[in-house]
Amino acid sequence: MTEPETLALLDMKDTEISEKSPPQASVLQPEEEGGTESPGAESLRVGSSVGSPTVREGPEDGPDSTISEAATLPWGTDPHPSAPLPDPPGWRDIGPELLESEAPIKSEEPLKEDANLLPEKTVRAFVPIDLQCIERKPQEERIKHREAGPGELRNFLPARLSHPEPPERKWAEAVVRPPGRSCGGCGSCGGREALRAVASVVAALIFFPCLLYGAYAFLPFDAPRLPTMSSRLVYTLRCGVFATFPIVLGLLVYGLSLLCFSALRPFGEPRREVEIHRQYVAQSVQLFILYFFNLAVLSTYLPQDTLKLLPLLTGLFAISRLIYWLTFAVGRSFRGFGYGLTFLPLLAMLVWNLYYMFVVEPERMLSASESRLDYPDHVRSVSDYRPRSWG
């Protein structure tokens, strides 16, 4: 076989090999373009020029023998740096139709920033991390809290730091602060509330003696003749029955509030609508005991002409407790006026009783003898006593 025929045969075999194995051709192609030739290529060229027996046996064995011999050539195992990556196994089984169908369709729309450009298998190897779930450091939270304006402070406050207030504090603040008003935390609201409370007590201090004197002078009734101490005590106790009216009314409202707001559990969460009436009833009972204890002692020292004060003080107690209940329910600081109308008469009676016990009649402090105020030299006799026309 002549040399031209051998070269033609080699060219035919090269074309068949390139058709059956395109990856090998692509691998060899960059090497030829780069100017570097592998040792296998040199041996192939030398054999073709000299007419080696390996090439001569090619036509007898067929193209398969040529591929096997090419596989046994002493090529380097390391891939060339400029060579592309080898294709995965099984690529020959994929038909051209599937490759065309799986080809990515270029969309005219620009890619989004959050679009996933990685293959599906690669995405599975990564675990997504939500930056919002990472706990921030307390220093960063403080910085943001300081930099935020007064209207934005509530937005940067994390939910996990908001500690719920106890229910007792909630309804107590709701009672002191009227609903619908917001406090900016400047501290002036507390001073105003205290000033209003003091002003209401001072108003009660001025209004209490004027009201008592006007009722004593202008109301058309007189107290009955009560010469003995026992009769005065009985009269005082009978007047005290009328003073229990606001307390009993408070108990009824308290029971209805328990039913309406389903607060029947004794150790459950207290509600503002229920606690208002409960505190009013408890405070009224305490003041009633102190008030009428001093009123009973006062009845033993008053002269006959001034016994009219007993029913007047009883009515003042009932009216003042109703005023306090109303102002306490609406959450006004002016409730000190109603409390002052109850506490100031109690304080005045206590001072009067101590004065008579230690100054006027110290010998009768612990005795049950008749008072000097009922003797002829202190009061009028029974014959001189003339009740008023309306008494």
UniProtKB/Swiss-Prot annotation:
| Molecular function per GO | identical protein binding
Question: Has UniProt tagged this entry with the keyword Transmembrane helix?
Answer: yes
Query: Which spans are transmembrane here?
Result: 201-221, 241-261, 280-300, 310-330, 340-360
Q: Where is this region: Disordered?
A: 1-96
Where does it live in the cell?
A: Lysosome; Golgi apparatus, trans-Golgi network; Membrane
Q: Which GO terms describe its cellular component?
A: cytoplasm; lysosomal membrane; trans-Golgi network membrane
Note the superkingdom of the native organism. Eukaryota
Q: How does it sit in the membrane?
A: Multi-pass membrane protein
Name of the protein described by the UniProt record:
Transmembrane protein 79
Species in which this protein is naturally found:
Rattus norvegicus
Instruction: Give the gene that encodes this protein.
Output: Tmem79
